[in-house]
Design a protein with these regions (language model features):
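Active-site-proximal alpha-helix that buttresses catalytic centers in soluble enzyme cores
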Residues: 1-152
């Protein structure tokens, strides 16, 4: 029997229904792009399903190799500590599984290009003339106490 691999998409979670919906839409689109893998998702906090539920689903489908990825822009406390703690606890509970952990999105040229394309789309859809020099794309997070984040400059 051919071994199947699973992908566990880990999100932060939010009390804002729109934020949860955006993550779920992203995860479902990703699932349609990665048809060679079983893919499930879960949130760390504030929303359901939780990460453990996604891991349960993969395990119940017979998946034994799970690649987990945090869908977060930067590596701070949640991506560095909290999600790995959930994964490690699950791994300890089910030692027959192999759970690996990827990295955060980070500053990547593809991400910057995608953001630039989105700005161009917004300019084209805007009423009236707006020059690129009059635009600004600002990404705002709640903030974090992780000292590594203060070192990031674009």
């Amino acid at each position: 029997m051919e071994e199947r691999y699973g992908v566990m998409v880990c999100g932060h979670g939010s009390r804002d229904e729109d934020a949860v919906s955006e993550f779920l839409n992203f995860a479902k689109k990703l699932k349609n792009q990665l048809l060679q893998y079983e893919l499930d998702w879960g949130f760390l906090e504030f929303a359901n399903p939780v990460i453990k539920s996604g891991l349960d689903s993969l395990r119940e489908k017979g998946i034994r190799e799970i690649m987990s990825v945090p869908v977060m822009l930067f590596a701070a406390g949640h991506a560095k500590n909290d999600i790995p703690s959930v994964l490690n606890a699950y791994q300890a509970q089910y030692p027959e599984l192999s759970i690996s952990y990827g990295r955060e999105l980070g500053i990547d040229l593809k991400l910057i290009r995608a953001a630039g394309e989105r700005v161009k789309e917004a300019i084209e859809q805007a009423d009236g003339d707006i020059s690129p020099e009059e635009t600004l794309l600002m990404v705002v997070g709640r903030g974090a106490s992780d000292p590594d984040l203060s070192l990031i400059h674009i």
